[in-house]
Amino acid sequence: MVELILNPGKVSLSQLSDVYWHERHARLNLDCRPAIEESCKQVKIAADSEVPVYGVNTGFGKLASIKINPDDSEALQKNLILSHCCGVGESIPNSIVRLMMTLKLVSFGRGASGVCWNIVELLQKMLEKGVMPVIPAQGSVGASGDLAPLAHMTAVMIGEGKSEYNGTIFHGADALTEAGLSPITLGPKEGLAFINGTQFSTAFALAGLFEAWHAAQNSIITSAMSTDA
C-alpha cells in the first residue's frame, strides 16, 4: 500500500480517513526536516543555558522554579513520561492509536515542538511496521493535553510500556526488537513535547466523524434499495 506523505497545514480529512479505515501508514514530507532540526538545535542551546526555560532546563508545574542540570535532562524527560503512564480501563482500538500517532507526526512536522529528527523517524517506522502501543481508554479529560494516553504511547518508544505487534502484546522494548527497531533516548523537552497535545481526543473526534460518514452513506444506500424494491 502506498504510504501517505503528510504536509502539516495541508493534511486532509480524506487522508486521515485512509489512516483510520485502511491502515495507511504515513510519513512527513522531507521538506519538514530543516525546521524540525533547527528547533531541536535551539532547544539544546536553551538546555545548556543559565536562562530558565520551562520544561527544558526547569522542573514542571510547581517545580518550575527548580533548575535542572543538563546531565539530569534525560532522566527528567523519562520520568515525566513514566509518571504519567497512569491510564486505566480497556485499551483503545488500534485504529485510534494509529490516528493518534499520525496526528502527533503532523504536530511535530510544524517544527515548533523542539524534538529531534530521530523521534520522527521512529514514529514513522512504528506506523510502517504496525507497532501499536497499548493505550488505556480512561485517564484524560483533554484539559492541558492528553497527558496519560500520550505518555503510554511514548513509553513504548523509550522501551517501556506495552505494545501490540503482529497480534501479540509485548513489553515495549521487546515489541521494538521484534519489529527490528530500537528505543530512543529523550532529549531536552522531548518528553514534554510528546504529552502536551490533544491527539488522543482529536483521534476519537475524527473516528466519530468517519463512522458517522460511513453510517450516512450506508443509510442512503439502504434507503435507495428500499425505494427501488
Segments and roles (model prediction):
Residues M1-A229:
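Conserved, well-structured ligand/cofactor-binding cores
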